[in-house]
């Protein structure tokens, strides 16, 4: 199939809809050159899609909020260059995704609110550079995530209300965690 290059999210959504309707929800979408797209928010939100998007060029994307929210997607996106993404809010919220994203460069992300809220994700994110993240509210709330994030640098986080509520991490919180956000300010001032 010939490469197709959408200029924006609206064009990309149209191409995805046609491909899924023509082939199946498990189709290969790597024929789409996504290098011009900067907004992928809500792209697969609520869809049954579980096809191949492993070769997508997402290097210019800034917004991935709710991209896979409540979706069945569980494909390989381990090689994605997410280094320019600024918001991943709700990206995998309520999704089935449990793939390898351990090597993602999230150093420019500012918002991770509800990123894995209610999600099946339990992968390794221990080496993520979250030093620029400011918002982690409900990030792992009601999820199965039980990984090691003890080395995360949360020095710029302004709010992490409910980050671990109803999750396995409630019982093994990292040393940097505080139940009270007013304590968080004190914790950060000691650093």
Regions found by a protein language model. Name each.
Residues 1-191:
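Negatively charged
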